[in-house]
Amino acid sequence: MPFSVTSDSKYVFFERTKRTWDEVDVCSVNTSTLEVKELIHEVDKPYRDPHARSVEVLNDGKDILFRSERTGWGHYYHYDGQGNLKNAISSGPWVSGHIAAIDTLQRTVYFYGYGDDPKINPFYYRLYKSNMDREGATLLTKEDGQHRVIFLKSKRYFIDTFSRVDMEPKILLKDNTGKVIMELAKPDLSQVYAAGWKKPENFVVKAADNVTDLYGVMWKPSNFDPEKKYPIISVVYPGPYFGFVPTNFTLDDSYCTRMAQLGFIVITVGHRGDTPMRGKAYHRYGYGNMRDYPLEDDKYAIEQLAQRHSFIDGKKVGIYGHSGGGFMAAAAICTYPDFYKAAVSCSGNHDNSIYNRGWGECYNGVREVEKVVKDSLGNETKEYEYKFRVKSNAEIAKNLKGHLMLVTGDIDKNVNPAHTYRMAQALIEAGKDFDMLVIPGAGHGYGSADEYFEKKMYRFFAKHLLGDTRADYWGDINRSK
């Protein structure tokens, strides 16, 4: 939480978290005496999610809103300024997400929620309203879609923009009861459709447990022929702090539309452990196994789609991902080497022992070991060691059978290029053939070299999944006559 200071500057509120990420305190400190008072203490095993957490100090420190997953579902709780629990604000087998607005005069909280209606995609943001002094939430945006709202200063009205990948945006002015006042704008996409653009399609499959529903999106070529068979490419991101699967209307998303035009079925699908938006049990699925947890679900989702649709060639499977998705793409082709035939792995954190320490220790787990140490006089003191072990892609590089392209920028400040270099070294030591692209001057994103990378990726997949040897030809299509 950010620091919050009372208007008289006498008290500062802050949050502190244990290194094992499973205990958190909300505290106040007296700026005159420097006395620290613990107001809220929360134990949340195996970890408290650092990205979905939320603490709001209101009314000059008299009210605190604290988001907790203590019931297995993320909801808000109202405490007074001394840390006494007053009431839950929301409850039930669904998730209360980030706060959109707070009206302190009316003591009303507006927040997004997910998964309250089993008939609607649980990843869709929908706006709810609660009085902070009692339990209960009212849904204000009932339309089936992904909602984004902007409140007017008075909090009496808000602009609601909602869409789906297969539905154009609608922009409505509503009052704070959810009543529609008027439609503000309507997009005209007639020229886009006239050019041949096709909407992607939503789908639902089962996770590898054959119980959990997974939600995905499929892109087809604009000249799609249901009588043909198409290779399939899975565009992935493992989370665990958010899911990648798009939910709102867009003309392109992470190369998916453009890649499909080469003659591929392109999908992106969720998996257990990818996001906190579906409750604690779903989100913590990957704890202790950062490398492997999303792989089985991705493979099983593709197998189901290939069985469901005769136009999908389940023997020609590719996978692409960036950052955590790059980590996942390389892990997938080395874990299931007979299933995935080609993988493009970009800027992947292939060895989380050298990535951001907090990231790995939170989502994979760190073990606290207490020991007693004696000094030269025999005095005993307690010390703590923290032990961290995580699986790396280098450990399974020897399994590679298909075609792998590694990509990194050479000045990546997020995922150090050493991750890719370690993976490359392991592949070389295992005698594996692979492609590699290092982009000079590029960081975690590829900037002006992005188009260059994009063409390299398209040619790579065309060659290894379509068998198109013309992909070895290099030319600038923007300058062709």
Segments predicted by a language model, with ranges:
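Beta-strand C-termini and the immediately following turn/loop, strongest in propeller blades
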Residues: 13-20, 55-71, 89-90, 103, ...
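Serine-hydrolase catalytic core recognition
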Residues: 9, 15, 146-481
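Multi-bladed beta-propeller domains
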Residues: 1, 29-53, 79-105, 114-119, ...
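A short loop-to-beta-strand structural motif that recurs across blades of beta-propeller domains
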Residues: 25-27, 75-77, 126-128, 170-172
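Beta-propeller domains
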Residues: 1-24, 44-62, 73, 95, ...
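Active-site-adjacent structural elements in folded domains
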Residues: 40-43, 47-51, 61, 93, ...
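Residue-level recognition of a conserved intra-blade site in WD40 beta-propeller repeats
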Residues: 5, 57, 101-102, 151
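Hydrophobic helix-coil surface modules that form long, contiguous segments used
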Residues: 14, 22-24, 33-43, 241, ...
